[in-house]
Amino acid sequence: MADPPWRFQNRTGKMAPEHKRLNRYGTMTLEDIMALPVAEAVAPTAHLYLWVPNALLLEGIKVLEAWGFTYKSNLVWHKVRKDGGPDGRGVGFYFRNTTELILFGVRGKNARTLAPGRSQVNFIASQKREHSRKPDEQYPLIEACSPGPFLEMFARGPRKGWTVWGNQSDDYTPTWNTYANHSQSHKEPATRRPSRKAKA
């Protein structure tokens, strides 16, 4: 899984002002992100969950392919308020964004999701936290749908059972328990759940 520090630019090639004022971390150019040797660091058969802003969808596809993966589907994160309504505090030139995307790609043979993934809806609804921080619900979803080992690039905190790479990964201790009290992924009700041990 990766959440790159995307650089937003307007049509003049400069950083868009609505993103510049919110920028609280260093960014990378598209070329630099594409050049990361991800293909050398992952297994021959692997899944990629790549976070990408709505405005940079095409750039996200380019990165996914540059890292040696083929796009298959996506997951949508819907940012909501405490009352469950859409959180309209996001930025956007054409629309006020209340969603972000995870592009799902695969590489290698027999790379289908595990059995739980075939009943997992591609939708997460949760409240926003710190700037650019993604929802905790992604972790159990990925762990249920994809075989390990698990790697998080551009990580902002440690995660049990994961290898984390990121300049903030040693500086933050997530409060998983408290966050779980007010945020949950959206799943369709089911009378029977597939076993997490099932093979793809």
What are these regions (language model features)?
Residues 1-200:
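Class I S-adenosyl-L-methionine-dependent methyltransferase catalytic core
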